[in-house]
């Protein structure tokens, strides 16, 4: 039986693996919309910027008064899958007893899922946090 945190992490990962962020063309618009919606009630300051309307980067920050900062970075673009090399649909996360399989699940959407969970729950997990924490979700790494 999965605990509550593991279930939420897998739900996030399942949702973001479904989003096509293949480079080329490298569109991250749908992913950015997901991040904004997921973090909507997090009380973090969320900024988006990009080179164009399709390649959008997100920064979510708690903006404390501290001079110390920590950045959690995830790139969210993936390579285009070679479908003949996949036994399953790369856009549908497959979960077995030990592993999760899906396009970008290891590089780097798995990290993005953890960062999203941490960002959303930052105040609850670390109520006395004094440092600046920034979560960046960037495109065009590939």
What annotation goes with each model-predicted range?
Residues 2-105, 122-130:
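Acidic/His- and Gly-rich active-site-bordering loop/insert found
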Residues 108-142:
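Acidic/histidine-rich catalytic neighborhood of metal-dependent amide-processing enzymes
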